[in-house]
Structure formats: C-alpha cells, structure tokens
C-alpha cells in the first residue's frame, strides 16, 4: 500500500518540472499521477522545488491546519507551485483543469518518523 509520504510525493511533487507555461500541464499531470480515477479530484497543487526543500518545511513555522489539527507548517519562503482546478463544465471521465502558476508559501501537514509532509493544506 502507498504510504502517506509517498502519496504526498505522487500528488504534489514535481521537482523536475519547472513551472510550465503549458496550459495542458494540469490535464496531463492529474491524469498521469492517477488523480482522475473514479472521479476528478477538484483541486490539486504541484510544487516545483527539490523534495528536500519541501520536507524541510516540517521544521519551519508551526501553524494550525484547516481542519484544526496542530501538525501544519508554513514555509519560510515562497515556492514555485502550479494550482490545478477542475473547470466547471468538466465531467468525469473527461477531467479538465485550469492551470495557474504561482509563487507562494506553502502549508503542509507532517507526521511520522522521519517527520515528513503527508498532506498539502494550503498556499499563502
């Protein structure tokens, strides 16, 4: 079974891809990373930074998570990210996403030993 840490990497890490200007980026990535199986995941963020930099966020500023849990952390610096949002007229299995590039801080939830990101909470 896929661990929470591995799931985070599959759903949110794209270190090799520089933030692309390709409008199809989200459509390709959401499908390629298995986030359109059974239903279209409505929103997803990819981070274009080295994995070590994203893992380091677990030791930065502790902030409350959206769900009220206390294991979320905000990055000290902005990161290159791509937000993927399902378009309103999109119908499964033809999931269609809007791609928007951002340079923002990220908030991730961390757990485990080693203490690593397991959930992408928000960008700020």
Curated annotation (Swiss-Prot):
Cross-referenced SUPFAM superfamilies: RNase A-like
Disulfide bonds: 26-84, 40-95, 58-110, 65-72
Localization (cell): Secreted
Biased composition (Polar residues): 14-24
Any single GO BP term: defense response to Gram-positive bacterium
Reactions it catalyzes: an [RNA] containing cytidine + H2O = an [RNA]-3'-cytidine-3'-phosphate + a 5'-hydroxy-ribonucleotide-3'-[RNA]; an [RNA] containing uridine + H2O = an [RNA]-3'-uridine-3'-phosphate + a 5'-hydroxy-ribonucleotide-3'-[RNA]
Keywords, alphabetical: Disulfide bond, Endonuclease, Glycoprotein, Hydrolase, Lyase, Nuclease, Secreted
Leader sequence residues: none
Glycosylation sites (chain numbering): 34
Subunit-structure text: Monomer. Interacts with and forms tight 1:1 complexes with RNH1. Dimerization of two such complexes may occur. Interaction with RNH1 inhibits this protein.
A Pfam family the protein falls into: RnaseA
Listed name of the protein: Ribonuclease pancreatic
Domain of life: Eukaryota
Binding site for substrate: 7, 10, 41-45, 66, 85
Gene this protein is translated from: RNASE1
Location of region: Disordered: 1-24
A GO cellular component annotation in the UniProt record: extracellular region
Annotated active site: 12, 119
Record EC number: 4.6.1.18
Any one GO molecular function term: nucleic acid binding
Recorded family membership: Belongs to the pancreatic ribonuclease family.
Predominant localisation class: secreted
Residues in coiled coil: none
Known role: Endonuclease that catalyzes the cleavage of RNA on the 3' side of pyrimidine nucleotides. Acts on single-stranded and double-stranded RNA.
């Amino acid at each position: 079974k896929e661990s929470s840490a591995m799931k985070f990497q599959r759903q949110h890490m794209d270190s090799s891809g520089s933030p692309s200007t390709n409008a199809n980026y989200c459509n390709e990535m959401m499908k390629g990373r298995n986030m359109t199986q059974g239903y279209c995941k409505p929103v997803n963020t990819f981070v274009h930074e080295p994995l070590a930099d994203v893992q380091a966020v677990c030791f930065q500023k502790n902030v409350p998570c959206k769900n009220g849990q206390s294991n979320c952390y905000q990055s000290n610096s902005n990161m290159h990210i791509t937000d993927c949002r399902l378009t309103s007229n999109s119908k499964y299995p033809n999931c269609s996403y809007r791609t928007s590039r951002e340079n923002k801080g990220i908030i991730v939830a961390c757990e485990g030993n080693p203490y690593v990101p397991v959930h992408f909470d928000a960008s700020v």
